[in-house]
UniProtKB/Swiss-Prot annotation:
InterPro entries assigned to the protein according to its UniProt record, in alphabetical order: DiS_bond_form_DsbB/BdbC (IPR003752), Disulphide_bond_form_DsbB (IPR022920), DsbB (IPR050183), DsbB-like_sf (IPR023380)
SUPFAM superfamilies, alphabetized: DsbB-like (SSF158442)
Pfam family, one: DsbB
Protein name: Disulfide bond formation protein B
GO molecular function annotation: electron transfer activity; protein-disulfide reductase activity
GO cellular component terms, semicolon-separated: plasma membrane
Described purpose of this protein according to its UniProt entry: Required for disulfide bond formation in some periplasmic proteins. Acts by oxidizing the DsbA protein.
TM region(s), chain numbering: 18-34, 53-67, 75-92, 149-167
Disulfide bonds: C44-C47, C107-C134
Keywords annotated in UniProt: Cell inner membrane, Cell membrane, Chaperone, Disulfide bond, Electron transport, Membrane, Oxidoreductase, Redox-active center, Transmembrane, Transmembrane helix, Transport
Membrane topology: Multi-pass membrane protein
Amino acid sequence: MSFQVVTGWLDNSPRRIFAFVSLASIGMLAFGQYLQHVVGLEPCPMCIVQRYALVLVAIIAGLTGASGRKGLHLGGAVLMLGSSGFGAYVAARQSWLQWYPPEVVSCGRDFYGMIETFPLQRAIPMIFKGSGDCSKVDWTFLGGSIANWTFVVFGLIVLLSLALIWRRVSRRVS
């Protein structure tokens, strides 16, 4: 399968791509809720931040796909790239913490306690410091943790976003 076939498909159906990404993100969020409320897994602060990134991706992709204006596709793809890139970064950081857990728990407070107790400019950096909870692997599928699989999905969304951007920009240049 050549790159032109893929980009041609992207060019002919970008709204379908945005709809697919939005539905996939919603599906991942639903699965996260299932793991939390049915299986009983408690999300760590990094998991919650990844959920926020997925919500952003779902909203951006959904609104862009629902719009009939092709001019919005480039902006939507750029915003989707930023949101999914951020989510991939957080998932990669959590995966790294799982592979190389810190010797000492570096963040003892829970997410909501930090947000309620500290001003936002202090709470947000505390969230990204990670904790023993973030390094704990509670569930795996085919040898990958939730953070590993979330990174894979965010990576695929990043690639789709880049392909959409490249195709749109290359059409404007030529």
